Amino acid sequence: MASHALLRGVPVALVDGTNRFDAYYIAEFARKVTSQRLVKQRVPPEQLLRQIYVARAFTCYQMEATITERLPAFLRNAGAPIAIIFGLLDTFYDEQAPLFEVQASVGRIITALHRLKADNIAVLLASLDMKLESKERNRLFPRVSSAMDHVLEAVESESGYHFIKEMPGHPDLITETGRMH
């Protein structure tokens, strides 16, 4: 989704809750599509990098403010139709944040994500389903995934990665959707 948008000159907003986004990957992607002649003309890495707007959140409070306030305003002003969010819940697993605040914050984020969808913004959440000591915080991922339209799990096998589609709210309904090598 994002790579095709970037190649067409469409801006993409990226929120990084993992602090692992690597801009060099985008530059490598540009070199790869150019060298394999997957595009009609050379795509300079700088061109793609100018179209990605990155916001990092280091605490759950920053993540909530970014998703509920800053991201919608930015998307509107920039005319960006795509938002990618890495590690939405990573900062919420911090035991320093009181659970009642975390749960309320996640609810506000889900509402904000639904508003983005209503505004025709494509949103991709990429998160790990982590197993934590806290049973209550382990419920955050299922809560978010059950509020999404589509949930895909990337599963590694000998032939590469393939995606398993889970039906939100119905984890027992699973279909294989495709392979990525």
What are these regions (language model features)?
Residues M1-A65:
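Conserved P-loop
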Residues H4-L7, P44-Q47, F74-A78, R115-D119:
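Conserved catalytic network of the ASCE P-loop NTPase/AAA+ motor domain
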Residues L6, F29-V33, V39-P44, D90, ...:
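Localized chelating/binding microdomains
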Residues P11, Q51, G79-A83, A118-L128:
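Loop/turn-to-beta-strand initiation segments
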Residues G17-N19, L88, L128-D129:
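Short, ordered loop/turn segments at secondary-structure junctions
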Residues Y24-I26, E95-A97, K135-R137:
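A short acidic (Asp/Glu
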Residues F58-R115:
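Phosphate-binding/switch loop-helix module in NTP-utilizing enzymes
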Residues H114-H181:
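Phosphate-binding/switch region of NTP-binding enzymes
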